[in-house]
Amino acid sequence: MMEFRTASMEYIERMCEITEDAKRQLRGMGLDQWQKGYPSREVWLKDIQDGCTYLAVDDGEVQGIFAFQTTPDPSYEEIDGVWLTDGAYASMHRVCVADGCKGKGVAGQMFAKGFDLAREMGFPAVRIDTHPENFPMQRALAKAGFQPCGQIHLVGGCEDGDLRIAFEKVL
C-alpha cells in the first residue's frame, strides 16, 4: 500500500536518481523540459529544508516525488487564458515517477495526496504546469481531474521564460 513521507536527507540520492531518469526520458521524447539543470540536487535539498516535498513509498521503495507549495507561484501571475478560481491556491511541482513504476497509478496517487493536503489546509484549488508537448503528463493531469487553463511563461531560474501549459483542479 502506498504511503507518503516528507522527504528527508536519507532519500536525497534516490530523489536525484529518479529525477535524472525523468530528465533522460524527457530528452528521449525530444523535449527541452528539465534539460537546463533543473531540478537539481540543490533544489531538492532546499525542498527538504523547507519540508515541502513528499515521497510516494510502496513496500519501502521510493516510487515517486512531488513538491507541494502553498505560496503564490510568480509564474502563475500572468496567464494567456483564465484560471478556474481566483485567490489562494496550492501548487504541485517537480512531479516524477521512478522508472519501472510508470503506468502503475503512482502519479494519480501523488495527485490525490496533493489534493488531500490542499483540502486539509483550506485551499480551494491546486495548480500545476507542464511542457506543451509532454503528452504523458498532460494525460495524467486530465485523468486526475486537472483542467487546462491556458499558457504561462516560467519566471526565474534556468527555465525562465519557457512556455508551459497551466492546469488547475478545483477541489
Regions found by a protein language model. Give the residues of each.
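Conserved acetyl-CoA-binding loop-helix of GNAT-fold acetyltransferases
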Residues: 97, 103-116, 139-143
